[in-house]
Amino acid sequence: MSIRIIPQDELGSSEKRTADMIPPLLFPRLKNLYNRRAERLRELAENNPLGDYLRFAALIAHAQEVVLYDHPLEMDLTARIKEASAQGKPPLDIHVLPRDKHWQKLLMALIAELKPEMSGPALAVIENLEKASTQELEDMASALFASDFSSVSSDKAPFIWAALSLYWAQMANLIPGKARAEYGEQRQYCPVCGSMPVSSMVQIGTTQGLRYLRCNLCETEWHVVRVKCSNCEQSGKLHYWSLDDEQAAIKAESCDDCGTYLKILYQEKEPKVEAVADDLASLVLDARMEQEGYARSSINPFLFPGEGE
């Protein structure tokens, strides 16, 4: 199954009635999203060997919250949704959609917000980005979207991505339409922008027991059934790994068919789990999965591969 976004005026009456039974997509709910993430990162930093880096990530997340409301985005995406729907493509496809200068405006605002909080190497990095030309910044964004991580140093990538993510999340929040599940391929990528997931979550509340993958760029969540590999959609050779016990709130789902894994967070075990924060704070589990020979099928927006990795 794949997911396609349908313009509201093209939905039939039966689709309008059934679209919300199991929502294929959950568009980003931006209110306090970044504050919640920052709060969770700070909480997880306590007694964590990665505490300093988690607190660093919390500073970026908090800055995203501030910049989000200081620099709103106004954009009519109706025509874009119709065109993408007709082509069966993600409406905000990172490989096709032209980038507006708004994202660089967001980056400069993030840098201004973060400067007083940074020192040493981190301050040098954002000052270097501040001096970069428009074309240099565009080249780095294009490299990240092409997974050419050797062209963007791992210390610059989180700042570039934070601005791009804000821009794409703002656009995703403006999408006028519904989503429909259809037969198709590439369910491992976000149906809204085509980026990768950061992790998946088995939710509580109105989507109790359903698993959704969280986009590492536009913050959209999309439904993928449980006990199926989110990367290759096979189900016969899945294994579940945790550092604690079978009741752990964070597990890695590995697949021997494609050799990859993705983390699953369980809200029923820990209601405060957050897709980005808890993934970043559990890198010990990633190390275990690497030892077992599995490759990660996701990327955390605060931790990009460096050159040679």
From Swiss-Prot:
One Pfam family of this chain: FdhE_central
Location of the protein in the cell: Cytoplasm
CC terms in the record's Gene Ontology section: cytosol
SUPFAM superfamilies associated with the record: FdhE-like
Main location: cytoplasm
UniProt cross-references to CDD domains, sorted A to Z: FdhE (cd16341)
Keyword terms of this UniProt record: Cytoplasm
Keyword Cytoplasm assigned: yes
GO MF annotation list: ferric iron binding
GO BP term (any one): protein maturation
Matches recorded under InterPro entries: FdhE-like_sf (IPR024064), FdhE_C (IPR056796), FdhE_central (IPR056797), FdhE_N (IPR056774), Formate_DH_accessory (IPR006452)
Function: Necessary for formate dehydrogenase activity.
Membership in a protein family: Belongs to the FdhE family.
Name this polypeptide is given: Protein FdhE
Native species: Escherichia coli O127:H6 (strain E2348/69 / EPEC)
